[in-house]
Amino acid sequence: MIVLSKEQIEEMVDPDQMMDQIEEAYRIYGSGEFYMPPRPTVEHENKQLMYMPCYTKDIIGTKILSIFPENSKLGLPSIDGIVLLNDYTTGAPLAVMDGQSVTAWRTGAVGGVGIRHLSRKDCRTVGIIGAGMQGFHQAVYACAARDIHTVYVFNHSDRDLTDYLERLKKAIDKEDVKVVQCKAVEELVRNSD
């Protein structure tokens, strides 16, 4: 069985390949070649566990998500989880993966696929509202989907984004891409394709 940590997943992710796999997932969804039951949720004392299984003809994927709102007081994420993969024929466990990382990269890839198919081919700038995990990954995939030269980032809080912007530039991994913090959402909208 394979066990993948956040760091290992981040080393392995290829944005173009991930977007291709998301397109394949859309094809499977459109064809109905899957079974996804309603997701059961177990709640106790303001804590939740959500189970999200999905079966295809080859594999079973299950995301188990924990929502523990009090974790923020401990400096921990209030939402966490894992992703399990099992063989469809035997049920044998194949992989356990960090759920936060898989979710962030997958959700970013969904946005990238949208940009691939719905944006102008000549887009050179993109605006990201929210300097959190999802905004980070949406920016990475926007730059993979189009020849983006400038990423504009606006965050609702006044916190210093220097470290965030540097990590984002490194993750985008294209020398000619600038990452710019906007002071107002209007500035972001005005400058974004």
Task: List each language-model region with its residue ranges.
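Short helix-loop-beta connector
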Residues: 118-125, 147, 191
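Glycine-rich Rossmann-fold phosphate-binding loop(s) that bind the pyrophosphate
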Residues: 131-132
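Short acidic low-complexity segments
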Residues: 175-192
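NAD(P)-binding Rossmann-fold cofactor-contacting core
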Residues: 145-172
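N-terminal Rossmann-fold NAD(P) dinucleotide-binding loop
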Residues: 135-136
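N-terminal ligand-binding/catalytic initiation module
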Residues: 1-104, 112, 122
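Aromatic pocket-lining residues of Rossmann-like dinucleotide-binding sites
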Residues: 142
